[in-house]
């Protein structure tokens, strides 16, 4: 796996981490050229999902943990947009790749453009959301026991995936509540 930071564009320009990811990609592409081996290079956006380590490298994990445990969260800019890949969607893509059916793409800056002969691979389902949208959803989830209002959570939606993630951080005493 690689990272969107390998683009070395925008906020990633000049990043040593991004440079190392790009060099790693090139090593795999060279190996494929020399040996004919199939190589699947993925540039993952921000990953999130159940039981991810909070206060490490995932704002979603930190926010879910903190809201579920009545800890403060800090959002410097509610309009900051993240591209997120849910861990279950990543696993589905990895299984497709293992079966010889990765989703091939090329990149238009940071956006995958899916095409049969693409140099890269990408999970077809990601979600672009703002920090403010994430926090607002988490606050609705937290209020559910008090309001008894189940938020609208369509199957396959970002809200459904975030709700599943949030529930994984709830202490067991908060999972049960009176009706």
Predicted segments with their positions:
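Alpha-helical elements of Rossmann-like donor-binding domains used by nucleotide-donor carbohydrate transfer enzymes
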Residues: 26-27, 62, 89, 93, ...
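Mid/C-terminal beta-alpha module of Rossmann-like enzyme folds, strongest
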Residues: 96-179
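A conserved pocket-lining segment of Rossmann-fold NAD(P)-dependent short-chain dehydrogenase/reductase
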Residues: 45-46, 65-85, 105, 114-123
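Active-site Tyr-X1-5-Lys
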Residues: 14-45, 59-69
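Substrate-positioning beta->alpha
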Residues: 54-62, 79-99
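Short aromatic/basic micro-patch
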Residues: 41, 84, 128
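A secondary-structure boundary/capping signal
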Residues: 2-3, 43-44, 125
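Conserved catalytic-site region of short-chain dehydrogenase/reductase
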Residues: 1-10, 16, 47-51
């Amino acid at each position: 796996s690689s990272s969107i930071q390998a683009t070395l564009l925008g906020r990633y320009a000049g990043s040593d981490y991004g440079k190392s990811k790009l060099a790693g990609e090139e090593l795999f592409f060279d190996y494929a050229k020399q040996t004919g081996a199939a190589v699947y290079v993925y540039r993952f956006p921000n990953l999130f999902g159940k039981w991810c380590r909070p206060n490490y490298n995932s704002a979603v994990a930190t926010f879910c943990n903190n809201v579920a445990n009545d800890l403060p969260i800090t959002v410097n800019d509610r309009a900051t947009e993240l591209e997120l890949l849910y861990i279950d969607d990543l696993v589905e893509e990895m299984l497709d790749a293992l079966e010889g059916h990765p989703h091939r793409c090329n990149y238009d800056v940071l956006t995958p453009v899916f095409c049969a002969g693409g140099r890269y691979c990408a999970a077809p389902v990601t979600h672009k959301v703002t920090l403010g949208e994430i926090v607002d959803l988490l606050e609705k989830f937290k209020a559910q026991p008090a309001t008894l209002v189940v938020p609208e959570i369509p199957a396959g939606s970002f809200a459904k995936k975030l709700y599943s993630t949030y529930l994984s951080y709830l202490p067991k005493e908060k999972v049960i509540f009176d009706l």
